Amino acid sequence: MTKLENPVLMATIGGAQGLRGEVRAKAYTADPGALGDYGHLHSMDGRSFEVLEIREMKNVVVVRFRGVNDRNAAEALNGLELYIERDNLPDEELDEDEFYYADLEGLEARDDKGVSYGTVTGVFDFGAGDLLELKGPGKRPVLIPFSEASVLEIDLEAGTLLIDPLAAGLVDDPEELSKFTPDKPKKKK
C-alpha cells in the first residue's frame, strides 16, 4: 500500500477493452502514449499498477496492467483514478512558460495593486483553452482564462499569480478597479 504525499492525477480508467484484462483510460498527460513512462501508477486506496502495454485509440489509451488478466478484473477498475507522486514529473522538460496543473493549485491570484481575487482551486481544459478556478473566502468560485493577457506573471516560489482583473473578466469597467483596496495583512498580537 502506497500513500502519496503530493498526488498528481494522470489517468481515469473507463471500461474494459476485450477479454484479456485491458482497460480504456483517459490519460491527462501531454502525450497520452507516455502514461507508462512515469513509473507505477497508484490509486488513492493504496493499490499500485504497473503498465505492461499501452496503445492509443481515438480519444483514449488502451492499457494492460500487471495482474489484471481478464475482463472481470478490468471491469472492477472502471472509474478508478490513477496518480503519481509530483516528484516523479520531470521539471527539466518544461519550457519557461509551461507549468504542471498541480503546481498552479493553491497559488493566490492578486492584481498589481495587491488586491486578492482568491486562490487557484482547479485548472480545467474544456477544449477552448485552459481555465483557472479561483475561490476566495465567502465568494463563489469563478473561472478565468489561463492566458498571457489574464495571467501576467506566475511566481511559484512566492505562491502567487499576478493577474489583470479586466482581461480576466473579473471586472467589467476599468473604473471599478479604483474601488478595490489591497488586502491588509492582519497584525500579529
From Swiss-Prot:
InterPro entries: PRC-brl_dom, PRC_barrel-like_sf, RimM, RimM_N, RimM_N_sf, Transl_B-barrel_sf
KW Disulfide bond (keyword) present: no
GO CC term (a single one): cytoplasm
Biological process annotations from GO: ribosomal small subunit biogenesis; rRNA processing
Residue stretches making up the PRC barrel domain: 96-169
Pfam families: PRC (PF05239), RimM (PF01782)
Top-level taxon of origin: Bacteria
Subcellular location: Cytoplasm
Keyword vocabulary terms for this entry: Chaperone, Cytoplasm, Ribosome biogenesis, rRNA processing
One Gene Ontology term of the molecular function aspect: ribosome binding
Its biological purpose: An accessory protein needed during the final step in the assembly of 30S ribosomal subunit, possibly for assembly of the head region. Essential for efficient processing of 16S rRNA. May be needed both before and after RbfA during the maturation of 16S rRNA. It has affinity for free ribosomal 30S subunits but not for 70S ribosomes.
Self-association state and partner proteins as the record states: Binds ribosomal protein uS19.
Family: Belongs to the RimM family.
Domain notes: The PRC barrel domain binds ribosomal protein uS19.
Protein name according to UniProt: Ribosome maturation factor RimM
Biological source species: Rhizobium johnstonii (strain DSM 114642 / LMG 32736 / 3841)
Lineage: Bacteria, Pseudomonadati, Pseudomonadota, Alphaproteobacteria, Hyphomicrobiales
